[in-house]
């Protein structure tokens, strides 16, 4: 095999002839030759050294340059202050200053060090060495001659790429050139940058990135104008189109200018949990001319104070949930809650638009500020201008393939600048930004991605590794960024999605480098090429010196996306933001005068085709799980917590056998370990140090975010130093790499080495311990019942992994809050609960067990509805309550229709209002629901149709006619009418398709759409709810039978009197009514809460007492009917279900002991009975009545119905009653009673009020109750409510 390559002669500028094969058009495969000057032997003789020493020094210089004086070449310790000639005379480094004889080479190949030079005289020996598989990656063969000495570099293709070997050989050439021609130059001033390097870099960096010199909200407005109805935000708490987001943000921006004086360069703090309102706030601030700064509500108050002090902010926009937190942290700031209530008043649009357009806002003004860790303990506030952000989002959208079809996950924390990239890149390019809740981020990220239909995400490798491609089949593109990519993560995702790898410090406006096509064959350190930027590799200590291709140096970013600098910190700004371009820049062609440069502090090198390879940091800044951390800031906090006599250091530790790095704090301690003698460490009890470590940790937790608090505190006798007297951080990292996580943890554990054996654990604890071991990368047998998850190195991401593993592997539920609130293994195991998964019900799934095939069923349903089968969207069974309502209305005794008459406000935008109604009609399938009967079974059908309006000329005539129109199978059960003069709206709905809560959801949604307020995401369908409670067979389960027979069994006390002849002849109809507002004395509701009681329990118990007082035997049991909300079942999203979840059940209250019980005990007993009923509340009154004769009699003799309901979200109490349309349209025409509702002679509605009381409305049959008797009954009920409530407040629980 011929290892040689053709050589070509060339002459360098100094006139010294060299011969090299590196200019071959075909890259060398195994070797390259360099012809040396003939006077080499004379030069060696002049210095009094062997010729090989000159070559070895040149080799050392080349290797040192290529590796930036790091890694395996640190041991060379060249004195950079000395001239090359001085080094030639004095330098003696035994590690490379060796002559390998032929005999040595013929020996054991494993004794030859890898990646070092060997100097031999016989080329054939080196050839043999390469061919026999030596571990030596590269070496050189020197052939001395007084006529034509030459040097051949040879490398092992299995250990080194040809391109890497070529670069090192080229560097060797340059080093030889310097040694021969410029021996007077100091080693530190030596540059091996060649013409070839210049030409290669010029080719890669020939084009200056395109700048987008515009305001970022102008880019957003372009999308609004082009696609106003496209989805802009899909969040867990609401959805917005581009037009709606534009309107809301413009309204808020006008208010910020009007009321708070926000103008260019005003910094506004934002403190939000994940929410659609955070997006509105961000956009509003930039529209107003200000710059936003996010703070994390979970960070310590000291952190909030430091950030506000750094930025001199005066205004905070926050959520209702975070307001108390931020107000306590920075009370000097004005806080403004941003939620849907903030937009309840219609603004003066003209005035606001004028304000916006009158601002003297420039792309040079600040758009946002982001704070990062600072070495002095003070956060660094990075100011990013509009032009930088606009340039960044344009470049990122193009490189990351974000467009109108993208649904982009917004996962990153708002304090992490990646969130800015997620949000503004999507919103300026027509994509939809998808926002899971904080709970979903931690507990069900895969589920959130699927529910939000996310097809593109940007995550750290740590978070991406929690997911698996199989869990998120709709995810098409995944971008890794924020921390170095891992091989494990790349291998998992590379063949499943379009995988990209990005890089970018916050000072460069999110991302400035991208590797767009990541595969298993590309190095995980490959961060690709610049996007919106040019990348340069400069000397780590001198940015005016470019590094040769392949040499490791500091990454310097140039371009319009570089930030302005650090706010009010010119010292630190001048350190890393160049005020003048580097001297070498002119040689690469013209550059805009405003070009900016940022010294990243990251080490990198040019790889194949100019792609950059990330190599680490040159200083004490690190990234841990995507968070940028200055180790010196943590050391600063440690120093403040300790005396001056105690030395400290913090390092990122990679314990042996663990892939999860942790922060380790080293503290000097008399009884500490000797880092030079780790093998002989004894783990004696160190109670005093443990107490010290606990105190320090508690103190710095008050000042630093949790991700900056060390997980390990290690006592050491002394901190290691380099020969120059600096802290030897490499030795600290090396020490940690030699020790397991368990060993390092024991160093600050007070438990002795011979601690008692592991306590016995129950199966739940053993299973959980195995998951701990997997997450924390420990041996499961080392985890004890009393171990603390957080003390063992757990953090929020580890908790997320634990929660996901518990659900996936154990089918058990655990929350992140559980992990943090109960970090002890034994306590945590007690919190494990069976996993309850919400099964999504597909269309027609609940009717597939019938006699008819699906298509035949659809045809039959369509025929009954007078429609075609393609208009049938879904079919599913009725709830027991719905079936009751429909059967009763079909009997002809009552219509079961509810009617709302709304007087529309005179200034209402009618077109917009009707459009809002139409959108909600489509959003809520229950409004498009009809009922049919197939084979004697009632089914409900969802129809694909548009809203239909009736336009009556007379309101009174329409109401009368509408009341006389009975419901019919197959026909719509929601009727919408708008009077011809557009003054009144009438909505008539069957009670089978709404309840109080769903009515509030419907009218609240109409109001929200009208006001351009985002609608919450629909996570639960009515079909899924029915699937949860549905029983395909009529008979009740045995557990239900047993419960109801026991609950309704006969008692010694008399029940209600038998039904009268009048009642038997005609069921009652509650056709009259009265109402009352009942408020409690101060402290009543608080007393309820202190006893663990609810207001609903109070209402129920008071009604039982009221009915009992009217009896001849007040101590006899009371039985009455009730309508329950039906939303007590464990089903996420059931509280916001826009459909009737009601359940009709009997209530029995045993009164025999009530006279002797204290109010608290009586109420507790009533509440316990209600709780016991929860699993059976959807059994249905008809099925309950059918159990046996005694149960039927008890149910038939119920005379009254009690309905307890909260004010649904979005409702307002007017002078007469709670009404969902009040906010939008004005008061109701009349307070219509819920007549024709059920067969009870008296109906009591109790609506729970937020101001400690009830709104009570009584409807009654005036043939059974006189108005005077009804008023007296209502008075008695009000008095009983007061008595019971007062009884709780007197001496805790006395009567």
UniProtKB/Swiss-Prot annotation:
SMART domains: PKS_PP (SM00823). SUPFAM superfamilies: Acetyl-CoA synthetase-like, ACP-like, CoA-dependent acyltransferases. Residues 221-624 are annotated as: Adenylation. Residues 1-24 are annotated as: Disordered. It comes from the Eukaryota. The modification O-(pantetheine 4'-phosphoryl)serine is found at residue 796. GO terms for cellular component: cytoplasm. Its cofactor is pantetheine 4'-phosphate. Keywords: Ligase, Phosphopantetheine, Phosphoprotein. Residues 759-836 form the Carrier domain. One of its GO terms (biological process) is amino acid activation for nonribosomal peptide biosynthetic process. It catalyses: restrictinol + glycine + H(+) = restricticin + H2O. GO terms for molecular function: ligase activity; phosphopantetheine binding. Its EC number is 6.3.2.-. Residues 873-1284 are annotated as: Condensation. Nonribosomal peptide synthetase; part of the gene cluster that mediates the biosynthesis of the tetrahydropyranyl antifungal agent restricticin that acts as an inhibitor of CYP51 and blocks the ergosterol biosynthesis. Within the pathway, resC catalyzes the C3 esterification of restrictinol with glycine to yield restricticin. ResC represents an example of the emerging class of single-module NRPS-like enzymes that perform esterification reactions. NRP synthetases are composed of discrete domains (adenylation (A), thiolation (T) or peptidyl carrier protein (PCP) and condensation (C) domains) which when grouped together are referred to as a single module. Each module is responsible for the recognition (via the A domain) and incorporation of a single amino acid into the growing peptide product. Thus, an NRP synthetase is generally composed of one or more modules and can terminate in a thioesterase domain (TE) that releases the newly synthesized peptide from the enzyme. PANTHER family: FATTY ACID SYNTHASE (PTHR45527:SF1), NONRIBOSOMAL PEPTIDE SYNTHETASE (PTHR45527). Belongs to the NRP synthetase family. This is Nonribosomal peptide synthetase resC. It comes from Aspergillus sclerotiorum.
């Amino acid at each position: 095999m011929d290892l040689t390559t053709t050589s070509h002669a060339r002459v360098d500028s100094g006139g010294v002839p060299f011969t090299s094969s590196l200019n071959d058009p075909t890259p060398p495969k195994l070797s390259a030759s360099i012809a040396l000057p003939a006077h080499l032997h004379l030069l060696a003789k002049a210095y009094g050294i062997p010729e090989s020493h000159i070559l070895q020094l040149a080799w050392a210089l080349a290797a040192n340059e290529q590796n930036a004086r790091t890694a395996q070449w640190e041991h060379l310790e060249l004195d950079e202050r000395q001239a090359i000639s001085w080094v030639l005379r004095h330098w003696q480094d035994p590690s490379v200053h060796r002559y390998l004889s032929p005999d040595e080479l013929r020996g054991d190949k494993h004794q030859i060090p890898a990646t070092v030079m060997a100097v031999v005289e016989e080329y054939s020996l080196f050839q043999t060495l390469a061919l026999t598989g030596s571990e030596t990656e590269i070496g050189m063969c020197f052939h001395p001659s007084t006529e034509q000495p030459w040097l051949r570099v040879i490398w092992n293709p299995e250990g080194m790429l040809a391109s890497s070997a070529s670069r090192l050989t080229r560097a060797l050439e340059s080093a030889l050139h310097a040694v021969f021609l410029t021996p007077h130059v100091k080693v530190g001033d030596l540059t091996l940058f060649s013409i070839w390097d210049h030409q290669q870099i010029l080719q890669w960096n020939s084009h200056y990135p395109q700048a987008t010199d515009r305001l970022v909200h102008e880019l957003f407005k372009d999308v609004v104008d082009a696609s106003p109805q496209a989805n802009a935000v899909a969040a867990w708490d609401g959805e917005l189109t581009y037009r709606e987001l534009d309107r809301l943000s413009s309204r808020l921006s006008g208010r910020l200018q009007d009321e708070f004086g926000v103008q260019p360069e005003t910094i506004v703090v934002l403190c939000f949990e994940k929410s659609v309102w955070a997006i509105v706030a961000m956009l509003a601030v930039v529209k107003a001319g200000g710059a936003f700064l996010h703070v994390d509500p979970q960070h310590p108050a000291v952190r909030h104070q430091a950030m506000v002090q750094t930025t001199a902010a005066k205004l905070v926009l926050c959520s209702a949930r975070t307001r108390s937190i931020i107000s306590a942290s920075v009370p000097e700031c004005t806080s403004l809650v941003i939620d849907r209530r903030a937009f309840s008043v219609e603004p003066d649009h003209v005035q606001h638009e004028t304000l916006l357009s009158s601002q003297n806002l420039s792309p040079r003004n600040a758009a946002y500020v982001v704070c990062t860790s600072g070495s002095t303990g003070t956060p660094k506030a990075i100011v990013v201008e509009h032009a930088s952000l606009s340039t960044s989002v344009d470049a990122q959208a193009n490189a990351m393939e974000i467009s109108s079809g993208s649904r982009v996950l917004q996962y990153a924390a708002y304090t992490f600048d990646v969130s800015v990239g997620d949000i503004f890149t999507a919103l300026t390019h027509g994509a939809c930004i998808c926002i899971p809740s904080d709970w979903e981020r931690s507990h069900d990220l895969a589920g959130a991605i699927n529910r939000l239909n996310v097809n593109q995400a940007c995550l750290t490798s740590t978070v991406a590794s929690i997911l698996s491609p199989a869990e998120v089949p709709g995810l098409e593109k995944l971008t890794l960024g924020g921390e170095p990519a891992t091989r494990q993560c790349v291998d998992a995702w590379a063949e499943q999605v379009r995988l990209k790898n990005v890089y970018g410090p916050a000072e460069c406006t999110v991302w400035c480098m991208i590797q767009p096509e990541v595969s298993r064959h590309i190095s995980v350190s490959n961060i690709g090429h610049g996007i919106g930027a040019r990348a340069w590799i400069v000397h780590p200590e001198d940015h005016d010196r470019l590094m040769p291709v392949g040499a490791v140096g500091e990454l310097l970013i140039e371009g319009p996306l570089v930030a302005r600098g650090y706010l009010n910190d010119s010292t630190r700004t001048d350190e890393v933001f160049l005020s003048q371009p580097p001297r070498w820049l002119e040689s690469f062609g013209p550059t805009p005068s405003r070009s900016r440069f940022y010294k990243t502090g990251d080490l990198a090198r040019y790889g194949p085709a100019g792609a950059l390879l990330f190599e680490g940091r040159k200083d004490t800044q690190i990234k841990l799980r995507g968070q940028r951390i200055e180790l010196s800031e943590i050391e600063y906090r440690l120093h403040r917590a300790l005396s001056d006599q105690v030395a400290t250091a913090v390092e990122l530790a990679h314990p042996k056998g663990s892939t999860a790095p942790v922060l380790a704090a080293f503290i000097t301690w008399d009884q500490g370990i000797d880092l030079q003698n780790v093998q002989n460490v004894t783990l004696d009890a160190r109670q005093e140090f443990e107490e010290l470590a606990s105190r320090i940790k508690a103190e710095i937790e008050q000042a630093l975010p949790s991700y900056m608090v060390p997980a390990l505190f290690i006592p050491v006798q002394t901190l290691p130093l380099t020969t120059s007297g600096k802290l030897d951080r490499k030795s600290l990292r090396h020490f940690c790499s030699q020790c397991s996580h368990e060993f390092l943890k024991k160093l600050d554990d007070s438990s002795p080495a011979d601690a008692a054996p592991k306590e016995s654990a129950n199966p739940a604890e053993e299973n959980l311990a195995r998951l701990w071991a997997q997450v924390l990368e420990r041996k499961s047998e080392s985890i004890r019942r009393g171990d603390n998850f957080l003390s063992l190195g757990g953090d929020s991401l580890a908790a997320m992994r634990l929660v996901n593993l518990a659900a996936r592997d154990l089918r058990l539920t655990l929350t992140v809050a559980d992990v943090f609130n109960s970090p002890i293994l034994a306590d945590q195991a007690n919190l494990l609960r069976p996993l309850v998964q919400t099964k999504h019900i597909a269309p027609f799934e609940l009717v597939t067990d019938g006699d008819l095939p699906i298509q035949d069923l659809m045809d039959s349903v369509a025929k009954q509805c007078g429609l075609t089968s393609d208009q049938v969207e879904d079919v599913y069974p009725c709830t027991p309550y719905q079936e009751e309502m429909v059967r009763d209305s079909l009997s002809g005794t009552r219509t079961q229709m509810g009617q709302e008459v709304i007087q529309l406000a005179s200034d209402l935008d009618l077109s917009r209002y009707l459009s809002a109604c139409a959108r909600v009609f489509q959003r809520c399938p229950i409004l498009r629901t009809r009922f049919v009967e197939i084979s004697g079974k009632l089914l409900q059908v969802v129809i694909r149709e548009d809203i239909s309006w009736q336009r009556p000329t007379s309101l009174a005539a329409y109401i009368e006619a509408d009341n006389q129109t009975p419901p019919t199978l197959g026909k719509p059960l929601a009727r919408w009418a708008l009077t011809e003069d557009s003054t009144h709206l009438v909505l008539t709905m069957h009670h089978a398709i709404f309840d109080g809560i769903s009515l509030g959801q419907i009218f609240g949604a109409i109001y929200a759409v009208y006001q351009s307020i985002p609608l919450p995401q629909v996570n639960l369908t009515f079909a899924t709810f029915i699937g949860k409670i549905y029983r395909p067979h009529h008979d009740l389960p045995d557990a239900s039978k047993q419960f109801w027979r026991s609950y309704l069994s006969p008692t010694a006390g008399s029940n209600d009197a038998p039904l009268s002849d009048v009642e038997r002849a005609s069921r009652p109809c509650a056709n009259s009514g009265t109402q009352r507002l009942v408020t409690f004395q101060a402290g009543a509701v608080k007393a309820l809460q202190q006893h663990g009681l609810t207001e609903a329990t109070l209402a129920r118990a008071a009604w039982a007492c009221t009915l009992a007082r009217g009896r001849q035997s007040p101590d006899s049991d009371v039985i009455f009917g009730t309508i329950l909300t039906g939303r007590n079942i464990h089903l996420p999203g059931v509280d916001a279900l826009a459909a009737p979840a009601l359940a009709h059940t009997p209530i029995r209250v045993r009164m025999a002991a009530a006279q002797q019980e204290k109010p608290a005990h009586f109420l507790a007993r009533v509440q316990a009975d209600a709780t016991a009923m929860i699993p059976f509340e959807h059994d249905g009154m008809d099925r309950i009545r059918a159990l046996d004769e005694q149960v039927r009699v008890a149910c038939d003799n119920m005379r009254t119905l009690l309905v307890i309901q909260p004010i649904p979200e979005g409702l307002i109490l007017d002078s007469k009653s709670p009404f969902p349309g009040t906010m939008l349209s004005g008061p109701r025409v009349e307070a219509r009673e819920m007549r024709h509702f059920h067969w009870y002679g008296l109906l009591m509605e109790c609506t729970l009020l937020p101001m400690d009381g009830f709104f009570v409305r009584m409807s009654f049959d005036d043939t059974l109750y006189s108005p005077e008797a009804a008023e007296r009954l209502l008075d008695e009920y009000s008095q009983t409510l007061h008595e019971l409530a007062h009884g709780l407040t007197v001496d805790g629980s006395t009567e």
